[in-house]
């Protein structure tokens, strides 16, 4: 049962290092592409949100880019208005219609 020993003297260290370098480069390239993809997505959402805010002067729903819609003196920002749910103030009628 002692025949299960391995002999590593014939392993070429240059090919081992070369393989490790190739794997490291591939993993690094993949990580860089993922990071740049996320950065490009953030800037694309910011650009679309800014264009929507400039074009439309009423309240917009800016899905996916809410952090960029919160600008000062921006009436169209979804965060500029506070919607109070009806279950918080059940006795208060906030509708614009007058009761009969």
Curated annotation (Swiss-Prot):
It is found in: Virion membrane. The chain crosses the membrane at residues 19-40. One of its GO terms (biological process) is proton transmembrane transport. GO terms for cellular component: host cell membrane; membrane; virion membrane. Glycans are attached at residues 3, 7. One of its GO terms (molecular function) is channel activity. Disulfide bonds: none annotated. Pfam families: NB. Residues 41-100 are intravirion. InterPro entries: InfluenzaB_glycoprotein_NB (IPR007288). Dimer. Belongs to the influenza viruses type B glycoprotein NB family. Putative viral proton channel. May play a role in virus entry. This is Glycoprotein NB.
